Amino acid sequence: DIVCYRRWGHNETDEPTFTQPVMYDAVKNHPTTVTLYEQRLLQEGIPAEEVEAIKKKSRDHFEEAYQRFQGGGVEVQFETLKGKWTGFTRINPSEPVTAVAEDELRAVADILTRAPGGFSVHPKIQKLLEGRRAMLAPGGKIDWGMGEALAYGTLLRQGYPIRISGQDVKRGTFSHRHAVLFDVKTDEEYAPLAQTAQKGAHLQIYNSLLSEVAVLGFEFGYSLADPHSLVIWEAQFGDFANGAQVIIDQFICSCEAKWSRMS
């Protein structure tokens, strides 16, 4: 077993002996990790001069950093709008133009509503695909599921990667999405959206584990590292967002003000 302990208090102003005097008396008299390691090296035949040189090198490193800080020679660098984020702006006062040409929509819709040859689509899903294809006919009306799919498809076609995660995102909790089709005979998966990707873009869509805070935390981190991707986390039901509230409050809402980052 490894027994871990804190030698000092919670911070530089904390005094642990106020509340745990007996334990911290034992800690005070216990050799430090450095002392124990030094004794082990000496037992193994490492010359004392070499051991002392290792200790001195570490002390000098920290002392040099401390002196540099004392002299005001340290400039804090933030990654805000630098590196991978170069070219992004803090404020966009006007709505961006997101419209695409009709023939572009039709090309994407054609891909989204067809399965490859030999792929056995569920009969109800086949009917849904046919219904979506009819939405682009004269007089047709596009529903939410098709509108969402067209938005994703046109973004992928323009070269923007898309990443979606959540507890039932492949199908959609209320069966509105069906971004991934399943062969009824083989269980093979097919994602029509992935076929719309161009210019190096790719689609990632994952049914996640049932830990909202863990998944949203990971996806938030992914969004920091890849600003050109559309990264989406979808709560299975509205109140499931409660499980990820700490990420929403501490990182997403306060991302720029608190952490000088954008997402």
Model segments located where?
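Flexible, glycine-rich loop/tail regions that form catalytic "lids" or insertion modules at the edges
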Residues: 2-263
